[in-house]
Amino acid sequence: MQILSVTAEIFPLVKTGGLADVAGSLPKALRAHGIHTRSFVPGYPGVMRALSDATPVAEFESLFGERATLIAARAHGLDLFVLDAPAFYDRQGALYVDRHGRDYADNWKRFAAFSLVASQIARGLVPNWRPHIIHAHDWHAAMSLLYLKYAGDDTIPRVLTVHNLAFQGQFPAHYFPELGLPAEAYSIDGVEYYGDIGFLKGGLQAADAITVVSPTYAREIMSPAFGMGLEGVMNERHADVVGIVNGIDLEVWDPSSDPCIEHHYSARVPLRRLPNRQVLLRHFGLPDTCGPIFASVNRLTWQKGMDLLAATAGEIVKNGGTLIIHGQGEEKLEAAFMDLMRRFPQNISVSIGYDEHLAHRIHAGADAMLVPSRFEPCGLTQLYALRYGCVPVVARTGGLSETIIDANDAALHAHVATGIQFAPIDEDGLRHALRRTFRLYRLRRVWEGLRRQGMKTDCSWHRSAARYADLYSELLNPDMRLVGSA
């Protein structure tokens, strides 16, 4: 089976978040099911530099007014199609925003062009290659399904994965005539969205199957509280929605061989983890208070609940703990954490930005990973934390509630607990969770059991890749049934 995976980012070539990790690791997991994936990505500078065996397969004289080349290539074990369009993707800023953090004004055009070419690949643009299924990820790629639908080609099943419904690709309606779609596409059954254009909404309407990244999130997004204005569409399509929890790449995230960390260890030899704690403290210039090291490797945003953490950080300091923050996001929150570091230089350290190697070292050295998200479709940080023996402290929402077993008395007695959940998701809820963490940390035997149980958890793609394989088979063989079984 051949799959065309359409994604705006893919690890290890280019990454801003969990989308890249999933897009990079799922194809590897699907190989065990006899499924070959070619991933189609924009030709950002980081992508172009990494390519090997690059061969031009199609030329575009005027793709939304710009010259472009479609390239077939390989990189880091991934089979790729790359849209080399310097006018769209060779930018000085980040993937979606400029150096000042503002969305590129032509994002609508950048990803409409990308989606249009994806639909053409699905229809046979590349000689001697055509997919059995097109699988688009998030709003950047969602329009590929709509272009394919309005091309009149219903022979290729269309799958859309929504990694976060909050990111929708919404643009002014006056761009619609430039999209190259028929007039009827600007309708409630197409891209029209509250008087604007909705790229994600258009993809949701055109998809044969919609996956989201956990069964809990699949249920949550049917409600106004989590539907982000799309709950009506999601309810209309509920029979075609399936929740599949993300996995992680166990080769990239393996504490027994990770080149990013100094001291290797595993669930069988967990004591070898201890020196990584001192390495981490030295890196951040912090003394060892002998209390737990709390960490957060996250976007500094309201969605991620980082304002709750900023408001409760004093609880960590008061109880003799240490807090390490690594991430970037809203200026107000960045400033709040920098202020906390100035106030408590012996207990709090903050690193604004994102560095993949440092993220690995933090997971290997910290005692507890804080994930206080107000909503979280799946989350990967808590899975990395489990794998690395860093106890997750998570809000009870979305995929967090499915992947972490709370350390209540019954779960601890049964030796199945893997972390700490909290609700309600507010300052008091998080503060209570921090106090629970301190209490458990002081019970050394209990804490080490919690850590070991987490490390034994299967965070791989094994089960989830099988679910995707079943979904693909169902779409090609309609007598089967998986969709709607969230």
Curated annotation (Swiss-Prot):
Cellular compartments per GO CC: cytosol
Superkingdom of origin: Bacteria
EC number(s) from the headed UniProt entry: 2.4.1.21
Gene Ontology molecular-function annotations: alpha-1,4-glucan glucosyltransferase (ADP-glucose donor) activity; alpha-1,4-glucan glucosyltransferase (UDP-glucose donor) activity
InterPro entries: Glyco_trans_1, GS/SS, Starch_synth_cat_dom
Gene3D superfamilies: Glycogen Phosphorylase B
Residues the entry annotates as binding ADP-alpha-D-glucose: 15
Top EC class for this record: transferase
Keyword Glycosyltransferase appears in the UniProt entry: yes
Annotated pathway: Glycan biosynthesis; glycogen biosynthesis
Catalytic activity: [(1->4)-alpha-D-glucosyl](n) + ADP-alpha-D-glucose = [(1->4)-alpha-D-glucosyl](n+1) + ADP + H(+)
Annotated keywords: Glycogen biosynthesis, Glycosyltransferase, Plasmid, Transferase
Pfam families: Glyco_transf_5 (PF08323), Glycos_transf_1 (PF00534)
Gene Ontology biological process terms, A to Z: glycogen biosynthetic process
Family that this chain belongs to: Belongs to the glycosyltransferase 1 family. Bacterial/plant glycogen synthase subfamily.
Known function: Synthesizes alpha-1,4-glucan chains using ADP-glucose.
Protein name: Glycogen synthase 2
